């Protein structure tokens, strides 16, 4: 009877879920992919998916991106204006407060929109995920258009509150600061966006989600914190772009030649940084292109 009981137990289905199903320790010399072999990599998204165009969820996601980017520009540009108008920086939140405004808004907005659109709120993030085949080209283009429109509207509302103050504060537009070259600015944007998009890939990694059930709920936190840290580092250099929609919206509403000086940096830099992050995570760390379905 004892032997039969042990046999029955050995044949029982493993009903453990979440982190309890995987061993805590990883033997030296083994790859992380050896853990949790029941995981299957999601299939790559098609470049064009016609069925999306007839789905309400597709348009709803774009609306969510528009509203999120609108709110992002509204709060962050207002914060920049509040700091700029004060004669004494000691009486304002300063650079740290500006960084918290950007990072905090990304944290809140990603949390709110992740279940609807994925919570991109940034063409560079969308571009990186497109390169990783996480979404279709159709959806990526739609997202970028809605993000840019939301950014323009958000900055426009801020300017409507006080045009003179908005103009004197530079409209929150990005520009390379005196003492730095365009190469410095481009490098800062590339590295800053790499940090952000790499964090996005790591925080939303489907394999980690399969292993640790708490990962999706915590994803907005490291993403927002990455934005905060990058702003602390690069506000003195470029005002921190790392988001082409944010840079475009502020430049259009500011409507000043200064806002367009070196504007290409805030598109080329973020897109290059996003591409590097996608390659690093998907090819170097996960080696997805070199795997076959038989390995999962």
Curated annotation (Swiss-Prot):
SUPFAM superfamilies: Aquaporin-like. This is Aquaporin PIP1-6. A motif (NPA 2) lies at residues 243-245. The gene is PIP1-6. One of its GO terms (biological process) is protein homotetramerization. Aquaporins facilitate the transport of water and small neutral solutes across cell membranes. Aquaporins contain two tandem repeats each containing three membrane-spanning domains and a pore-forming loop with the signature motif Asn-Pro-Ala (NPA). It is found in: Cell membrane. CDD domains: MIP (cd00333). The chain crosses the membrane at residues 63-83, 98-120, 141-161, 183-203, 217-237, 265-285. GO terms for cellular component: cytosol; membrane; plasma membrane; protein-containing complex. InterPro entries: Aquaporin-like, Aquaporin_transptr, MIP, MIP_CS. GO terms for molecular function: water channel activity. The keyword Repeat applies. A motif (NPA 1) lies at residues 122-124. Keywords: Cell membrane, Membrane, Repeat, Transmembrane, Transmembrane helix, Transport. It comes from Zea mays (Maize). It is a multi-pass membrane protein. Belongs to the MIP/aquaporin (TC 1.A.8) family. PIP (TC 1.A.8.11) subfamily. Its main location: membrane. The keyword Transmembrane helix applies.
């Amino acid at each position: 009877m004892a032997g039969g009981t042990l046999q029955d137990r050995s044949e029982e289905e493993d009903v453990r879920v979440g982190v309890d199903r995987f061993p805590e320790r990883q033997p030296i010399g083994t790859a992380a992919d050896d853990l949790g072999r029941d995981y299957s990599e999601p299939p790559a998204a098609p470049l064009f998916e016609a069925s999306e165009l007839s789905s309400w969820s597709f348009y709803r996601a774009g609306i969510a991106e528009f509203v999120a980017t609108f709110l992002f520009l509204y709060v962050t540009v207002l914060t920049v204006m509040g700091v700029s108008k004060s004669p004494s920086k000691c009486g304002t939140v300063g650079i740290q407060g500006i960084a918290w405004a950007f990072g905090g808004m990304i944290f809140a907005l990603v949390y709110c929109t992740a279940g609807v659109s994925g919570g991109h709120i940034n063409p560079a993030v969308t571009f990186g995920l497109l390169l990783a085949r996480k979404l279709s080209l159709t959806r990526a283009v739609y997202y970028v258009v809605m993000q840019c429109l939301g950014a323009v509207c958000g900055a426009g509302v801020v300017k409507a509150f006080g045009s003179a103050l908005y103009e004197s504060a530079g409209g929150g537009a990005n520009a390379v600061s005196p003492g730095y070259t365009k190469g410095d600015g481009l490098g800062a944007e590339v590295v800053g966006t790499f940090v952000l998009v790499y964090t996005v890939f790591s925080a939303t990694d489907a394999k980690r989600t399969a292993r640790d059930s708490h990962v999706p709920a915590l994803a907005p936190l490291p993403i927002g914190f990455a934005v905060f840290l990058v702003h602390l580092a690069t506000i003195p250099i470029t005002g921190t772009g790392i988001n082409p929609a944010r840079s475009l919206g502020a430049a259009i509403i500011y409507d000043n030649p200064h806002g367009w000086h070196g504007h290409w940096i805030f598109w080329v830099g973020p897109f290059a940084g996003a591409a590097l992050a996608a390659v690093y995570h998907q090819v170097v760390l996960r080696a997805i292109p070199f795997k076959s379905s038989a390995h999962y």
